């Protein structure tokens, strides 16, 4: 109790708000990429070996960060509960480009975070759609700009 209070006091020196989240260990997180409210890509991000996150920022002997594997799957192969929850979560923010990270626990999809600037890496998030992924994203932003310009 005393150790927790000391840690909280230290954290509150740097921020007026703290967010606590239940630790839910899983083999991987789902990342559902959404564009304009629709699922765009689905990836499994596996935890770094011997670590509780997908990235282990404690460097290995070469000075590189250690990261877990990934697996990109077609949207139709992602669990429907994960897709539905990702769509609902992102809708609370808007219809832009989002990456929603979730865990599936006993049939329950739990949102871990919503990224408004999701990473889209070559041969990772684009592994299923290829160049079509980038075409869809660029086309979306061109339409947004055209709507703004027309006003």
Residue ranges and their predicted role:
Residues 21, 100, 112:
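Active-site flanking residues adjacent to catalytic metal/cofactor-binding acidic residues
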Residues 38, 44-47, 114-119:
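Short beta->alpha transition motifs characteristic of CBS
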Residues 14, 54-108, 132, 136-149:
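A long amphipathic alpha-helix within ATP-dependent nucleotide-binding catalytic cores
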Residues 32-34, 108-122:
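A short beta-strand motif that forms the metal-chelation/ATP-contact edge
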Residues 49-59, 120-129:
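A short, polar/charged loop-to-alpha-helix boundary motif
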Residues 1-30, 80-84, 148:
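Active-site nucleotide/adenylate-binding loops and adjacent lid/helix of ATP-dependent enzymes
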């Amino acid at each position: 109790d005393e150790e927790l209070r000391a840690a909280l006091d230290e954290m509150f020196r740097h921020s007026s708000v703290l967010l606590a989240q239940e630790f839910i260990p899983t083999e991987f997180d789902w990342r559902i990429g959404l564009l304009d409210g629709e699922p765009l890509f689905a990836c499994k991000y596996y935890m770094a070996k011997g670590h509780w996150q997908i990235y282990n920022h404690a460097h290995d002997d070469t000075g590189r960060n250690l990261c877990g594997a990934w697996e990109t799957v077609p949207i139709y192969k992602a669990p429907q509960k994960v897709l539905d929850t990702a769509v609902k979560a992102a809708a609370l923010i808007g219809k832009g480009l989002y990456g929603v990270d979730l865990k599936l626990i006993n049939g329950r999809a739990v949102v871990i975070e919503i990224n408004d600037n999701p990473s889209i890496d070559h041969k990772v998030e684009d592994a299923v759609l290829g160049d079509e992924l980038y075409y869809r994203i660029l086309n979306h932003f061109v339409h947004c700009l055209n709507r703004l310009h027309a006003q």
